[in-house]
Design a protein with these regions (language model features):
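Active-site His/acidic residue clusters
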Residues: 36-46, 59, 202, 224
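Long, internal low-complexity/basic segments
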Residues: 53, 166-183, 188-262
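Generic enzyme active-site microenvironment
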Residues: 33
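Charged catalytic carboxylate motif
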Residues: 7-11, 77, 210, 250
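Soluble non-cytosolic domains of exported or imported proteins
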Residues: 2-9, 72-73, 189, 202-206
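A long, amphipathic alpha-helix that forms part
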Residues: 1-28, 85
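Substrate-binding rim/cap in mid-to-C-terminal beta-strand-loop elements of soluble/periplasmic
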Residues: 13-21, 42-93, 97-108, 125, ...
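C-terminal cap/loop subdomain of S1 sulfatases and analogous C-terminal strand-loop tails that border
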Residues: 38-39, 86-184, 206
Length: 262
């Protein structure tokens, strides 16, 4: 971990040195941000904070050093910020906003999505507001720990062993159990690790309704493609790549087509 941090620091230093040699440093914005999710369950490929909250640093002309911002920013906001910095008009079709603009209005919410990753078919949506996170799990007949590329990780084997021996506590079984709730609501201010699901808590009924509406509007406005099953071409490509690992029922359709052709 520390070696990775050191190497990253060295590489950023090399980039800055190259910009200075080329006379570009004083006229360049530098964005440094991470990939999504650490190599852990409930992080990589999922919509909890460990999977979607990215650290990001921006430095360059007009940006005061050592500032810390806590407002919501989406990954789709980076491109508009870059275009604006280069003096290029932001196209109207882009949903992102220039979060470096002087007249920028902080986002009221951010939406994130999870569909098929590798061969594992899933459908989850989340709405994040300054205080809450709302998650909608559409495929409730499938556990979070359905077969995936992570199965050979030592930690995956350990978790499955713990599940088989019933060594997991109630909090751990929220993610590693055989079922998942259709809705999850977390108070990020008081529960940053997203352990206490408040979706059925009467005290948070208003917040639940508000976040449901935000998601429903987003799905309608964007024409969320996750509303329909993936195309035969997409499923066939996954099937050819992953073979017998493709165990979700959606693959039965393309397997039948292949069988019919043969």
């Amino acid at each position: 971990h520390y070696d990775c941090l050191l190497k990253t620091d060295e590489q950023v230093g090399e980039i800055i040195a190259a910009l200075k040699r080329g006379g570009l440093y004083e006229n360049t914005l530098i964005f440094c941000f991470s990939d999504h999710g650490y190599k852990l369950h409930r992080h990589k490929q999922f919509l909890y904070e460990g999977g979607i909250q990215m650290p990001m640093m921006v430095a360059g002309p007009g940006i005061k050093p050592k500032q810390v911002r806590k407002d919501l920013i989406s990954g789709i906001d980076i491109a508009p910020a870059c275009l604006a910095a280069a003096g290029i008009k932001i196209p109207k079709h882009m949903e992102g906003a220039n979060f470096l603009a002087k007249d920028y209005q902080p986002r009221k919410f951010v939406v994130a999505a999870r569909d098929r990753c590798d061969f594992t078919i899933e459908r989850i949506r989340t709405v994040v507001t300054p205080r809450y996170k709302y998650l909608r799990n559409y495929l409730t007949d499938r556990p979070f720990m359905q077969p995936s590329y992570k199965d050979n990780w030592p930690v995956s084997k350990k978790f499955r062993e713990m599940m088989a021996k019933r060594e997991m506590n109630e909090a751990q079984l929220i993610f590693f159990g055989s079922k998942k709730a259709p809705e999850e609501l977390y108070d990020l201010a008081n529960d940053p690790h997203e352990i206490r699901n408040l979706a059925n808590d009467p005290k948070h009924r208003k917040a639940l309704a508000q976040h449901r509406k935000l998601l429903a509007n987003w799905i309608k406005e964007t024409g969320d493609k996750g509303q329909t099953t993936e195309s035969d071409a997409g499923l066939l490509a996954a099937l050819k790549r992953w073979g017998d690992k493709c165990v979700n029922p959606e693959y039965d359709r393309v397997r039948a087509l292949l069988k019919k052709k043969n």
